[in-house]
Structures are given as C-alpha cells and as structure tokens.
Regions:
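Predominant activation on well-ordered alpha-helical scaffold segments within soluble catalytic domains
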Residues: 55-59, 79, 98-102
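A short acidic Gly-Thr/Ser loop motif
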Residues: 18-23, 76-77, 114-118
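Phosphate-binding/catalytic loop of phosphoryl-transfer enzymes
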Residues: 83-124
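A short, basic/flexible loop-to-alpha-helix module at the beginning of a structural domain
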Residues: 1-10
Length: 124
C-alpha cells in the first residue's frame, strides 16, 4: 500500500521526518518557512528491509524536491540502527510525538499511539 502527496516548495528550508516502524516506512517533508506546508509524503511497507526502504524514500523525495537546506531526522521502532548506518539524527518516537503534540496542541492531556508492534500512551 502506498500513499504519496507532492506539492511544489517555495523556499529552501525543508524539514524531513522519516518514521521506520515495525512494518512500514513513512516520510514527510514540510516547508519550514511557510507554516509547515506539506511538500511531500510517502508511506510504504518495508518487508523487513528498513535500510533499503529508507534509501528508496529519500531518493523518491529527492527526485521531486531539489533543495539544499534540508533537515532530516529518523524516528520509529526500526529507525535506530538505520540512523546509525546512514549517519542521520535519531529521535525516540515517544519523545518525537510528545514534542510535536505539545507544539501543535497546547492543551493536550493524553495521547495514544497504536503502532504495528505495540501501543504507547503519553500523559502530559
């Protein structure tokens, strides 16, 4: 199952996040200069080949968006070894979710995330 969305960027500052889960790889690119406008997203099953899946996602992103100022980070249950091999920053997924939720929803009290291998609950 794949889901892609692509729009054209207006600026060079792009935030790219890749979530490597137990069964899928998700990538999203946001315009950091224009209210985090969605520029690119993709979702694909990795069939237990996380590194190849991440590389494919990055190549797909780069084929659509040719920018120089890209900030990239990996998260997810399968991302730590991939980040080490590719020398890309890693943020633990519960921490990443907590930071994003508190930034977007200042009054959030509880968050529940259902993943492919586990479920997580965050209390603020």
């Amino acid at each position: 199952m794949m889901n892609k969305e692509i729009t054209k960027p207006n600026e060079q500052n792009i935030l790219v996040g890749i979530d490597v889960g137990s069964t899928t790889t998700k990538i999203v690119a946001l315009d950091a200069d224009h209210d985090h406008q969605l520029l690119f997203s993709d979702y694909a099953r990795h069939h237990a080949n996380q590194i190849a899946s991440v590389i494919k996602s990055i190549k797909e992103f780069c084929s659509h968006i040719k920018q120089k100022k890209i900030r990239l980070c990996l998260t997810g249950s399968g991302a730590k070894p991939v980040s080490s091999i590719l020398k890309v920053p890693f943020v633990q997924e519960v921490a990443a979710n907590a930071i994003a939720l508190q930034d977007k929803f200042q009054k959030v009290g509880t968050a529940i995330e259902l993943g492919g291998q586990d479920a997580k609950m965050i209390f603020f």
